[in-house]
Amino acid sequence: MGTPYTTDLIYDDLFTRLAAEHENFHYHTAISRETHHNGQPGQYVHHLLEKQMDTFDPLLSNPRTLLYICGLAGMQSGLFQVMAQHNIGDGYFTLKDQLADIAPSDWDLSQVRRGVKTTERCMVEVY
């Protein structure tokens, strides 16, 4: 779950408890506007995905996994970029021809909006 501040984490106690009680429930947070206790700057969800790809790759590679992206418009582009760079976008989105010859790291928000088409396994609600 990604939020600007730890105080914005909804259902944090519940998700933390579920993660402790169930080995198949995993709860990860990305806090963007707070410095971490180790002095590292905040991070967005796509930064967390990139840093912990070894953890997320098996989950995202599973054909039964569904992805729900909700939040500010623009944040989905970072997720799509990281997923495409690691070749785990298949099943979640397809690319239109206009993005075929552009490296995912070079995609901008307008290109993502026009050139990425999500599948039934990827729900996006952005505002």
State what each model feature region is.
Residues M1-Y127:
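Reductase modules of NAD(P)H-dependent flavoproteins
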